[in-house]
Amino acid sequence: MNPVLQRLQSFSAAEEFLDFFGVEYEPSVVHVNRLHILKRFNQYLNRSPVPDDMDEVTAMATCKALLKQAHDDFVKSTAAQEKVFKVFQDQDGKSISLDSLKASLATRGQRA
């Protein structure tokens, strides 16, 4: 494993990653989307792996760019739109009208 990636294993907060790479970030975006940002960063790392033999300067620059991209995804969009986690991927096309919900609740109330 690349030494830069090894150092990341000790981090637990999104802010630690962002500070380590010197990525400027919006605290309000990170507060709401921290897990989404880290998951997206991991997805980007999987698509553009950092080889074990990549020099530290290049590895740092690569990771910084990928983390900045992950953060910026959630500046411009929402977690539901980005669909990083499965719970958001399963929501497409599933909506329930308010009238349908009211009718369902009324039917349940009659059975009780």
UniProtKB/Swiss-Prot annotation:
The gene is nifW. Homotrimer; associates with NifD. GO terms for biological process: nitrogen fixation. Disulfide bonds: none annotated. Belongs to the NifW family. HAMAP family: NifW (MF_00529). The keyword Cell membrane does not apply. This is Nitrogenase-stabilizing/protective protein NifW. Keywords: Nitrogen fixation. It comes from the Bacteria. May protect the nitrogenase Fe-Mo protein from oxidative damage.
